[in-house]
Amino acid sequence: MPATPLKSALQIHRINNTNTATNMISHCHKQPQTATSNGGATLHRRITACCPVSAPETVGRHHTHTVGSNQCSSAVVQHIAAPVSTVWSVVRRFDNPQAYKHFLKSCHVIVGNGDVGTLREVQVVSGLPAATSTERLEILDDERHILSFSVVGGDHRLANYRSVTTLHPSSNGSGTMVVESYVVDVPSGNTKEDTCMFVDTIVRCNLQSLAQIAENLARSNRSSSLA
């Protein structure tokens, strides 16, 4: 009889050891990482904080995933010195993820017009263990700034991948805190730790790219308003 899937709740903590998985992507800043456990059951629920953060209490509600026995789950937090509205204008474009996800070459919408249920096919850059990914938009909440998608097909090794991204005003009111969490099957021949290290690296690079783009956009908007 299969074990009952466990629910992994958001736990933000400082990470204290390193892993060579981050070396695979030279332009992404390295971040120390670790894994946590709950009641003896390994959840591999980690938070990689790209800077010191104070997460709103509501964050955990959106980033609690049911984690199967052969799955891992993790999250990355990124502070961005730009308003939520500016960051959201980039994140919400389900039809244009390559705008800040530089490991994607292109995106083609297969079904839908950007509403929940829309399907997209993305082409992955060479050098990663993937070629294409077919993804379904699960949540697009413009009021609460939540986007979620799931991987439903393609040529890759990340089966049953589901991601949730939320945006929150920074506690000091000067920017945005982005939290992106995921749950994914552990590929055959890999460990939960290795899988989370790999995906964390990709997500972290994406969010660092998002920060650069949104901050540049915010500066441009400020300059235009003063002109």
Q: Each predicted region: which residue ranges?
A:
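Short amphipathic alpha-helical segments embedded in low-complexity Lys/Glu-rich regions
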Residues: L104-V109, T195-C196, L226
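Hydrophobic ligand-binding cavity/cleft-lining segments
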Residues: P2-D115
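Glycine-rich portal/gate segments that line the openings of hydrophobic small-molecule binding cavities
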Residues: P2, H79, S85, R92-A159, ...
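Structural signal for hydrophobic/aromatic residues that build the beta-strand cores
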Residues: V87, V91, R120-V122, L137, ...
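A general secondary-structure signal for short beta-strands and their flanking turns/coil
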Residues: S69-S73, G117, A130, N160, ...
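Eukaryote-biased feature marking scaffold/signaling PDZ-domain proteins and nuclear chromatin regulators
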Residues: Q71-S73, A82, R144, R162, ...
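Beta-strand/loop substructures that line and gate deep hydrophobic ligand-binding cavities in soluble
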Residues: P2-P5, S150-C205
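Short, highly charged C-terminal tails/helix-capping segments
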Residues: Q208-A227
